[in-house]
Amino acid sequence: MNEPLLLFRGIEKTYAETNILRNVDISLYPGKCILLSGNNGSGKTTLLKIIAGLETPSRAEIELSGKSHSWKSAIRSIRREIIYLHQQPYLLSGTVESNVSYGLRFTHLNRKQLRESVKEALEWAGLADVAKHQAKTLSGGVQQRVAFTRAWILKPKVLLLDEPMANMDIESRQQACDLLKRMKSEGMSIVITSHDMNIFDGLIDSHCSLSDGKLD
């Protein structure tokens, strides 16, 4: 197996003296997808947010290039390489095209390069025919694909998805899985939380379960 992109070790999180996460280790590999399951309140979302740098752990270390660093000192250098997506797409008001282009507006790309990148992304995701549609008027499955594409265009190394297939019909799930498989084939590391691993046709490489704050 390839060297891991990131190793998170000894993750702990305590809320009001309750141990939500207890000494959790997780390794993220390029081109691999982890399914993270567990009951509601087991800490799945908390773990994803700690990996993404959106929530501070009580304790954690990150291993980079064979050296261990505290979470606080290391997360700043890797935060831009990680994208976390909530169960809800949280699209902006405006067209599909403007949603997909949003993150690129804060990069060095000029207008021509931005337009070309957005066009490529929309074609890649099979969204070119709805590019000018108002994003929030589309079905939930299409909105989620827009959110995936908005993430993909920024070329993160790690994509964290919190219950991404909730409330999708079978066809929408298959289309979303197809996009995620393509991301994985390009070397992206993906972590998905879900209660049902049977809906991720051929996508999952490994399965971990959170219970009593520990990862099995």
What are these regions (language model features)?
Residues 61-77:
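ABC ATPase NBD Q-loop/coupling interface
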Residues 52:
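Helix-to-loop junction immediately C-terminal to a conserved catalytic motif
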Residues 112-130:
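Conserved ABC ATPase "signature" region
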Residues 169:
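ABC-family nucleotide-binding domains
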Residues 159-162:
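Catalytic Walker B motif of ABC-type/P-loop ATPase nucleotide-binding domains
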Residues 194-195:
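H-loop/switch region of ABC-family ATPase nucleotide-binding domains
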Residues 134-138, 142:
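Conserved ABC ATPase signature
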